[in-house]
């Protein structure tokens, strides 16, 4: 789910999300995947429910492995998707939360073993990295409340907060928009794709 700049603002904005790397990156992996990218009309309950309905539509009408359905959200899209996976954690095996704040609940994620990868620049200009740490702490606490060990939590929850040097060495100096670089990292994408609803947490 893309951010504000690729939301739906009328016909002139149609398809602006299709060149977004957060969409294209998944199609360039060796594994066959169905990739769906929606354009938000807001980042509140309307788009949350639309995201869930879109997921359900593809599950019901296409050849989808229901144990391997994933979500990704960047910026405003992350605000929406964190709510969507919290509302329907039974649908998703893993979620990539990029450069965003967490607007959903934590407990439903832990109760349904949804794996979450959180990526935020240390000096993100819009949200600040404290938002990412807060989300990580909330999810970690929810998994501990469930009785999981640190090792088990490590299988399900990762926080990555790169410093300025990480971005500057890649000629990136706007750290919020630079958060899109997470979609260039096949290690992260493959971590998401490695998760399954049928996977036993060791």
What are these regions (language model features)?
Residues 127-145:
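Short alpha-helix in the alpha/beta-hydrolase fold that links the catalytic acid
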Residues 40, 96-104, 123:
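Active-site nucleophile loop of the alpha/beta-hydrolase fold
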Residues 30-31, 110-116:
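Short, proline-enriched alpha-helix->beta-strand connector loops that line the catalytic pocket
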Residues 43-75:
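Gly/Ser-rich "nucleophile elbow"/oxyanion-hole loop immediately N-terminal to the catalytic nucleophile
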Residues 78-89, 95:
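Short glycine-enriched nucleophile-adjacent loop
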Residues 119, 125, 144-202:
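C-terminal catalytic histidine-bearing segment of alpha/beta-hydrolase fold enzymes
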Residues 1-52:
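Active-site machinery of serine-nucleophile hydrolases
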């Amino acid at each position: 789910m893309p951010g504000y700049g690729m939301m739906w603002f009328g016909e002139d904005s149609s398809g602006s999300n299709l060149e977004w790397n957060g969409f294209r990156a998944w199609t360039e992996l060796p594994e066959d995947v169905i990739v769906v990218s929606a354009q938000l009309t807001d980042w509140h309950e309307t788009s949350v429910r639309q995201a869930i309905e879109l997921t359900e539509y593809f599950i019901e009408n296409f050849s989808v492995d229901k144990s391997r359905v994933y979500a990704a959200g960047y910026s405003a899209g992350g605000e929406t998707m964190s709510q969507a996976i919290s509302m329907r954690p039974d649908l998703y095996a893993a979620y990539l939360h990029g450069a965003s704040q967490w607007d959903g609940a934590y407990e439903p994620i832990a109760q349904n073993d949804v794996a979450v990868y959180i990526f935020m620049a240390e000096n993100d200009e819009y949200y600040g990295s404290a938002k990412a740490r807060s989300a990580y702490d909330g999810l970690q606490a929810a998994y501990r409340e469930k009785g999981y060990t640190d090792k088990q939590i490590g299988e399900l929850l990762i926080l990555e907060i790169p410093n300025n040097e990480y971005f500057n060495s890649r000629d990136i100096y706007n750290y919020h928009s630079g958060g899109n670089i997470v979609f260039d990292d096949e290690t992260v994408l493959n971590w998401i794709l490695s998760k399954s609803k049928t996977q036993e947490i060791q």
